[in-house]
A protein has these predicted regions:
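ATP-dependent carboxylate/acyl-activation modules
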Residues: 1-189
């Protein structure tokens, strides 16, 4: 609950991010605060969000070394199959429209070719003095997200945005899943 978030920030070192759970487009809705230092800033951010005391929030370490933010989305497209969409992400994804799509399954080489098709590829390579992204880690993260389709037959769509490509590593910091109820299969005994 939101009332526990202030206490939770004490267990994390450095600055934190506070997000309201279950809200799409958290930035526009005023349901995310980043770079907060200490309990007083977390408390003030929660007050500004005007959440119910029992609202669920997530407190996590603030990642400040992102080379670029990416969109990684998988979506069921009947009758074709699963579509993987990659793009320059974060809050700019709709504005820039810099995306490319592939049909699953894919391998690492296909993911790299797709990333290179993005107009924002130079950002991944390291642009204007920024270090390059850890391409191996980024590709592994993308393939891991794509692999979720095999584990979740109820999944319709999974949008990970942003996935932060870092000089060392990559991390998904927000995701939105759409699932459907599946009929229960009964096996005779």
């Amino acid at each position: 609950p939101a009332v526990d978030a202030v206490a939770a920030c004490g267990s994390l070192a450095g600055r934190v991010v506070v997000k309201a759970i279950g809200t799409a487009h958290k930035t526009e809705a005023g349901r995310v605060a980043v770079g907060l230092a200490g309990a007083s800033e977390v408390g003030a951010a929660l007050d500004a969000m005007d959440l119910a005391d029992d609202a669920e929030v997530l407190v996590e370490d603030f990642v400040d070394d992102a080379v670029v933010e990416l969109l990684v989305s998988i979506r069921r497209e009947p009758p074709v199959g699963w579509l993987l969409t990659l793009g320059i992400g974060g809050t700019l994804v709709e504005l820039l429209g810099d995306t490319t799509s592939l049909l699953l399954p894919v391998d690492a080489a296909e993911v790299i070719v797709a990333l290179r098709r993005l107009a924002g590829w130079p950002l991944i390579e390291g642009h204007r003095g920024k270090p390059p992204a850890d391409l191996d880690a980024l590709v592994a993260t993308i393939l891991g997200i794509a692999g979720v389709v095999e584990m979740r037959p109820d999944l319709v769509e999974l949008e990970c945005n942003p996935v932060l490509a870092r000089p060392v590593g990559a991390i998904t910091v927000d995701a939105l899943a759409t699932v459907v109820d599946l009929p229960v299969r009964r096996t005779p005994v």
